[in-house]
C-alpha cells in the first residue's frame, strides 16, 4: 500500500478523427519510441481498410473486437506451503481493457501481412467475428482459469 496520497488516473482525450477515447488509448498502446503520429497513421490506415473490406463502421468493428478479446478471469501464481498454485481471479475492468488492447497488438504483430496497417485491420476484423490470435489468447487464459478452478479458495 502506498503511504502517500492516491494518484488520480489520467484522463485520455478522445482521438481527433473518430472522437473515441478507446481508439486514443489503443494509439498509445501501439506507439513505440514515442512516435504517436506513426501509430495514428497505422491505426487510421487499418480503420480505412476495415471500412473498405467490410463496409461497416470501423469504430463499431474496433469496439466489437475489444469486447470479444476482453478476459473475464485470469490466473495468478500464489505460493502456499512450498507449492505454487495458479489461482483464478476475476479481472478488473481497467486491466480487462489493457489486456485486450495488448493482445490485439501482439496478435497483429505476429500476422503475416506486409504492413502493420494490414495486419491490424485483419486482426481487428477477425477478432470482431470471434476468430484470430487475440481471441485464441483469451480462450487460452479462460481455459487455464477453468482448469485451476479447484484452487479458487486461495483468493488474494
UniProtKB/Swiss-Prot annotation:
InterPro entries, per database record: Ribosomal_uS7, Ribosomal_uS7_bac/org-type, Ribosomal_uS7_CS, Ribosomal_uS7_dom, Ribosomal_uS7_dom_sf
GO MF, one example: tRNA binding
GO cellular component terms attached to this protein's record: small ribosomal subunit
CDD domains attached to this UniProt entry: uS7_Bacteria
GO biological process: translation
UniProt keywords, alphabetically: Ribonucleoprotein, Ribosomal protein, RNA-binding, rRNA-binding, tRNA-binding
Role: One of the primary rRNA binding proteins, it binds directly to 16S rRNA where it nucleates assembly of the head domain of the 30S subunit. Is located at the subunit interface close to the decoding center, probably blocks exit of the E-site tRNA.
Subunit note: Part of the 30S ribosomal subunit. Contacts proteins S9 and S11.
Family, similarity comment: Belongs to the universal ribosomal protein uS7 family.
The protein, known as: Small ribosomal subunit protein uS7
Organism of provenance: Nitrosospira multiformis (strain ATCC 25196 / NCIMB 11849 / C 71)
Amino acid at each position: 500500500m502506498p503511504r502517500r496520497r492516491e494518484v488520480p488516473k489520467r484522463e485520455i482525450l478522445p482521438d481527433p478523427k473518430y472522437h473515441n477515447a478507446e481508439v486514443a488509448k489503443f494509439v498509445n498502446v501501439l506507439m513505440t519510441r514515442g512516435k504517436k503520429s506513426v501509430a495514428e497513421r497505422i491505426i487510421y490506415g487499418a480503420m480505412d481498410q476495415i471500412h473498405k473490406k467490410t463496409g461497416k463502421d470501423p469504430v463499431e468493428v474496433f469496439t466489437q473486437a475489444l469486447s470479444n478479446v476482453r478476459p473475464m478471469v485470469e490466473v495468478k501464481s500464489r505460493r502456499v506451503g512450498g507449492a505454487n498454485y495458479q489461482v483464478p481471479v476475476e479481472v478488473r475492468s481497467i486491466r480487462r481493457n489493457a489486456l485486450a488492447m495488448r493482445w490485439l497488438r501482439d496478435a497483429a504483430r505476429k500476422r503475416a501481412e506486409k504492413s502493420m496497417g494490414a495486419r491490424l485491420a485483419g486482426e481487428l476484423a477477425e477478432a470482431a467475428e470471434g476468430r484470430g490470435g487475440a481471441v485464441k489468447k483469451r480462450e487460452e487464459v479462460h481455459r487455464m482459469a477453468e482448469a485451476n478452478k479447484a484452487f479458487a479458495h486461495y483468493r488474494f
